[in-house]
Every structure is written in structure tokens, then in C-alpha cells.
Amino acid sequence: MSPQTETKASVGFKAGVKDYKLNYYTPDYETKDTDILAAFRVTPQPGVPPEEAGAAVAAESSTGTWTTVWTDGLTSLDRYKGRCYHIEPVAGEENQYIPYVAYPLDLFEEGSVTNMFTSIVGNVFGFKALRALRLEDLRIPPAYSKTFQGPPHGIQVERDKLNKYGRPLLGCTIKPKLGLSAKNYGRAVYECLRGGLDFTKDDENVNSQPFMRWRDRFLFCAEALYKAQAETGEIKGHYLNATAGTCEEMMKRAVFARELGVPIVMHDYLTGGFTANTSLAHYCRDNGLLLHIHRAMHAVIDRQKNHGMHFRVLAKALRMSGGDHVHAGTVVGKLEGERDITLGFVDLLRDDFIEKDRSRGIYFTQDWVSLPGVLPVASGGIHVWHMPALTEIFGDDSVLQFGGGTLGHPWGNAPGAVANRVALEACVQARNEGRDLAREGNEIIREASKWSPELAAACEVWKEIKFEF
């Protein structure tokens, strides 16, 4: 080989594998107002220092790769790289740390939750140096959140559309979730709405199956809600699930719902995907439809305490992508949810400005500026005895959804709906009179049941139901 063609490792640039912390651990970095900030929970492999683990997360979720590459010299890595700027140990846990990472805003496409997650969590979770990794929280700067439309309408516009104020909204998921014909499904919807509910709901896995095709369901449900509206004088809604196998089919279903004149459609935003969800949210805003969001598959992502992603991150992403309602756990029913932590992400869904509060799992102060709020939906194993606690915990700006707690009433769907509406009105009145729902809740329900045989029957059926696993 001639001297002119001889290749040496030292020629051109300094190649090889470097410790991530040399470039990506920067404890002196002062975060910018425009940075996206992330708090991870990292469990390093034995022998990996926390600084190296935190720097590896910053590198692999931004500009880094496993070796030095010559194209690094064609850009300014200092401008674009993520930086691990602080690390703290997790109290009470061995070998767990919270590294904080700052990402420059230019790393992300405007208005794309898909791109944001692809960058921040798309690749780094399989990194060998980490035994486990969890994204606990994100700080979304106004400079980025303003590139999103957010919820199609928001809380106040929804109340104005429905003409319902001063109380939580009441809903019900139609059961059995699978197997009913479209006509019988519509009958169940009608009975629930006539009895006093504001909404009924398709279950998340009701799409367009052989036993009930979507178009038939949409037609019978529209007939049911118009009939219930005429009889009660109240505006009613049914969450028609538009989720489908393709975005084109999803949009076709949403268009048909709009043509029927119904007020609201539904989407499974995690299984359907953020791109599809954002497209549907844009359509809903442009065409006056409310959008109910189900979080099917969330526990696959958020249930493990040391790996995955906390639901507060998914909730923030949903507010950006778009949805007027989203399921948020109950604290009291059959589905898991800790009270303070749940209320933390409920505030992140509803409020404009949320202060940092680690006791509620909020790692960063979040300013949503003018992004509309999302109504949290409490659903899963709840019944009339839970009504005082739910009214106190979630407040007026929420949707309380009783599936089995309505349809399981011994007298039928309509009496089940009556029982829930009477219980809710009693709790709201008691609260407005200054009574303590936490201490007097059972007494308030018993007093109301004296004037409502439907509520009395419900109280008897569910007096000893508890979910203790």
C-alpha cells in the first residue's frame, strides 16, 4: 500500500468510543425557557455510574450514538445535543436516580407529539447500560405548546354546547361491551340517557365487528339520543368510537357522525396513535364535534414503577395532541390510582398553570398559556356509594362514568341512571350547603335514598362491594 492511500485511525478525526458523560453531563448548564425538560428514573446496570447513565440517556435521546462519527464535525453539537444537567438519588430506593435532561427546542418538529416521543423515548429504553428507565415528567415550554391546537374545544366550550353547569357530568359505558346487536345497543343507550345520564359510551374495543357494524351502531345510537333529548329536554351525547384500522376509515366514521348531528365522537389514542389522534382532533374542532379519549393500553406503558412512562406524561401529550375528555383513573374503584398523584395529573389536564409539587409527582412548573383544558373521566368499578368521594376528589370539571354501576341496577338501565343522577345531585347540593362529603358522604346518600326508590335499590345492591386485591 502506498503512503498516499494508507489509512490510520489517527488520521481525520479522533475516532473510538467515548464516555457519554464527557459531552452530555453538564451540571453547570442553566436551562432555557425554550428547553423541553425531562425527568427520568434510571436504574443503571451494576458498575455504571449514575452520571454516565444520565448522560447516556441525554445522548441517545438526542444527537449521540455509540461512537464518534466524522459527520459530527459538520454541525454544532453544542447547539443540538441534550444535556443531563442534574442528578438526584431516589429516596428509599437502591441504585435508582432521577437524571434531569434539557433538550433544545430545535430538535423537535412543531405540532408533532409523534416526533417528540420518537426522539425522547423512541430508542433509549433498550440501552444496555440501563437496567430500567422510566420517563416521569416533561416540561413543555410555551414556545412548543403554542405550536399545537390542543383539545378541539375545551371545558368551557363543552359546557356551553351542552348547557350543563355547576356539577360533574354523568356517563355510562354500555355493557356487555361486546356481543349486542346494534338495535339492542341503541335501546340500552336510550334507557340510560332517558334516566338522567348526560352521556353513554362505546367501550374501547367496540369498533366494527361482525355482530355490530359501525354504521348500524351509529344510526341506532343517534336515534336513541334524539329520542332521549326530546323526552327529557336535556342535551345528550353518546361517545361514538371512530377508532379504526386506518386513518382514512377513522375519518370516514367521524364524518358520518357529524352528518348525523351527534355532539361527540371517541378515539383510543394510544392504540390508534398520536398522528391519527391529532388529525381527528383537528377535524373535530373544524366541525363542532367534541372528542372523548380512551387510554386503552396505558397500563402496558405506565404501570411499572421503574420502567416505561408515567401517565402524567401521556396526559400532557394528550392535551397537546387533542381531546376534550380523557380517562384518568378513579382513586376509589377497581382500577389503580393514588389520590395525590392522580390529582396531580388531573390538574395538568385542566389548569392553565401548575406549580412544581413533588408530593403530587409534578417535577416541573407547567405553563399551558392558552391551551384549552381536558375533562378527566373517572371510570372503572364505581357505584353510588362512591359518589360523595368522587364529587369531592374530582370537583365539577369532570365526567363520572358508571358502567356496571348503572347497568347492574336490579330494575334495569333507566332506574340505574336515575339512581346515579339522584346521588350526584344530592352530593352537589350537600357540598354547596357546606357539608363535608368525606365525613358525611354515606349519610348524604342514605338521606337521598329515602326520596328515590331507584337509589335505595342501588344502595342495597352495592352496599358491600369492594375491590381488594
UniProtKB/Swiss-Prot annotation:
The keyword Nucleotide-binding does not apply. The keyword Acetylation applies. Substrate binds at N123, T173, K177, R295, H327, S379. The active site is at K175 (proton acceptor), H294 (proton acceptor). Keywords: Acetylation, Calvin cycle, Carbon dioxide fixation, Chloroplast, Disulfide bond, Lyase, Magnesium, Metal-binding, Methylation, Monooxygenase, Oxidoreductase, Photorespiration, Photosynthesis, Plastid. GO terms for biological process: photorespiration; reductive pentose-phosphate cycle. Pfam families: RuBisCO_large, RuBisCO_large_N. It is an enzyme of class 4 (lyase). RuBisCO catalyzes two reactions: the carboxylation of D-ribulose 1,5-bisphosphate, the primary event in carbon dioxide fixation, as well as the oxidative fragmentation of the pentose substrate in the photorespiration process. Both reactions occur simultaneously and in competition at the same active site. Heterohexadecamer of 8 large chains and 8 small chains; disulfide-linked. The disulfide link is formed within the large subunit homodimers. This is Ribulose bisphosphate carboxylase large chain.
